[in-house]
Amino acid sequence: MNNCINKFIEKYKPGENLQKPDEEILNFGRQMLPKEIIELWEEYGFGEYGDGLLKVVDPREYMNSLYTWLGQKDFNKIPIIVTAFGDIFYYRKLDDNENDVSLLNIHYRKIEVCGYSYQEFFEEYILDEDVIKNVLRADLFKQAIKEFGKLDYKEIFFFTPALVLGGGEDIKYVKKGNGAVHHQVLLQIGQ
């Protein structure tokens, strides 16, 4: 496996109940994503990494949500990882030689580029201690696990009231529930 993915695996140990990809998603991925991401899927699978702080996801499960947030379907933008708080990291193929990984932060309704290549994302960005603390909300995640228990595959932690409505990034505002439903709720709030 590629070195950039190895660093990710070392930092975020794969969970026990990972799901192997089917041929349909592998064929799609081979056309749209770098081979290293496909190798991650094949060797380990979809599910929780880093005790659930991150989930490597089957893109089909988050494409509709991502494209709704972005306002259009664009198969050059593929969801690859979701945080425990439901934010989506997605791969963007910009042209034949250029790509990056961006973050859709559903709580603050913003998008930011996280790495100017998928290698930079896996080798630097996602391993950075400030990112782990502030973007992934690792400390709050640990408190939420203690309070609510581990997340099921389709669950996320979220804030009530929503952060865009004045909630806070504090355990007293955290709840646990279905990620797809909460994505839609937050999207509706902003419309």
Predicted regions and their residues:
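A surface-exposed partner-binding patch
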Residues: 1-102, 155-191
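Compact, glycine/acidic-enriched structural inserts
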Residues: 100-136
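Short alpha-helical interface elements
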Residues: 62-69, 105, 126-128, 146
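An amphipathic alpha-helical core segment
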Residues: 121-174
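Low-complexity, flexible helical/coil segments
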Residues: 74, 89-94, 113-123, 137-143
